[in-house]
């Protein structure tokens, strides 16, 4: 849980939390997948792939939900973006609140953002808007919702969810990133700089 929270909010060193979970239970497939995702986002691709392959091996006899979760992570690392995205969409139809499956789909560097497809910003927004009724007051999801709205020009629609994110989790780096985007797109650059100057000094990396 700790590693997932750190990873989804871009806080420092989530891989260390996943390592502790693996030390406590070496056969915990989702911890290996989480570690793989964290390592991949830190550009440690070979280590990430090894961790994901271990997760796949350990997930073989687990329920479909866990297997699918691990597979999305591994396909993303292996470069199978189209397959990863298709699997993620199918997974989210059944398990709409699985954050570790949704996360790779979101953001400008996600499976949708990097697809190169026309209308990808609207596609990302449609996905999160469809999932919104399942999520409630969750800072990870509110960040994704706000970002998708900013990217489609709905600045005011993004304001409430990102403000709520930072109320719930003031040190969320993803939340701070989206808030900075919102200020920029709204033309409030002075306010955006003030926000960042206040937020950044305590961020570890």
Protein language model features and the residues they cover:
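Structural motif corresponding to the intra-repeat A-B loop/turn of tetratricopeptide repeats
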Residues: 9, 42, 78-79, 112, ...
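Residue at a conserved register position within TPR or TPR-like alpha-solenoid repeats
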Residues: 6, 39, 75, 109-112, ...
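Alpha-helical segment of the N-proximal tetratricopeptide repeat
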Residues: 1-20, 24, 70-80, 114
């Amino acid at each position: 849980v700790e590693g997932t929270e750190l990873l989804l909010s871009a806080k420092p060193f989530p891989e260390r939390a996943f390592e502790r979970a693996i030390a406590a239970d070496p056969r915990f497939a989702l911890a290996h997948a989480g570690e793989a995702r964290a390592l991949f986002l830190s550009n440690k691709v070979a280590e990430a792939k090894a961790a994901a392959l271990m997760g796949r091996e350990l997930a073989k006899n687990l329920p479909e939900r866990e297997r699918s979760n691990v597979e999305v992570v591994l396909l993303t690392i292996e470069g199978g973006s189209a397959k990863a995205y298709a699997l993620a969409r199918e997974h989210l139809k059944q398990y709409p609140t699985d954050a570790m499956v949704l996360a790779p789909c979101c953001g400008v560097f996600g499976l949708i953002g990097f697809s190169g497809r026309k209308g990808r910003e609207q596609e990302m927004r449609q996905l999160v808007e469809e999932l919104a009724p399942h999520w409630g007051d969750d800072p990870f999801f509110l960040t994704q919702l706000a970002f998708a709205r900013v990217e489609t020009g709905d600045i005011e629609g993004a304001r409430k969810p990102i403000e709520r994110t930072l109320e719930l989790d003031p040190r969320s780096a993803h939340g701070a990133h989206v808030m900075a985007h919102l200020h920029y797109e709204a033309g409030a650059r002075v306010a955006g700089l003030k926000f960042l100057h206040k937020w950044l000094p305590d961020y570890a990396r």
